[in-house]
């Protein structure tokens, strides 16, 4: 499995990402993660919709909390042909608890804790921490990767304006 040392940092300290860096224009790798009820969910389930994949280290951290709430706010404005998936290594039970406490109902959270299927397929699994790096991917309705944003410093938020601009070009 490919490793990319220094691809991201946490508080300035370099970290290693496991998995190949995905590229715009290639088929989005399928993956399986667990929903809040422990049911397996594949990316291919959403074929026919544009998917925003938001990868976060943990919903129980301030930046991930803020980011996921922002995406939830926008999700209600996007219509039925766009699906936002927030993926972390948090257990499904923790994701369900967090969504309930935060009032997040317009996007779907998925847990990659079991197999790191998403993390390795998209090259965002942090080797040293077994957490996901902060990143945003947009997959078009045909399953093609149309946008990638790896946030270099894990403690920073993504560039939301760039995500929404890219989404306009895809949907």
Language-model features, listed with the residues they occupy:
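Chalcogenol-based redox active-site neighborhoods
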Residues: 1-171
């Amino acid at each position: 499995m490919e490793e990319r040392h220094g691809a991201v940092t946490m508080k300035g300290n370099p970290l290693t990402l496991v998995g190949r860096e995905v590229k715009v224009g290639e088929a989005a790798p399928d993956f399986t993660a667990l929903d809040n009820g422990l049911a397996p969910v594949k990316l291919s389930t959403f074929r026919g919709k544009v998917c925003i994949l938001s990868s976060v280290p943990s919903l129980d951290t301030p930046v991930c909390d803020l980011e996921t709430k922002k995406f939830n706010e926008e999700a209600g404005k996007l219509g039925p042909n766009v699906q936002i998936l927030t993926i972390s290594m948090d257990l499904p039970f923790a994701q369900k608890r967090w969504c309930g406490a935060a009032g997040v109902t317009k996007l779907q959270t998925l847990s990659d804790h079991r197999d790191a299927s998403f993390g390795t397929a998209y090259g965002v699994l942090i080797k040293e921490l077994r957490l996901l790096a902060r990143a945003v991917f947009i997959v078009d309705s045909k399953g093609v990767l149309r946008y990638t944003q790896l946030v270099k410093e894990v403690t920073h938020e993504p560039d939301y304006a760039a995500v929404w601009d890219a989404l306009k070009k895809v949907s």
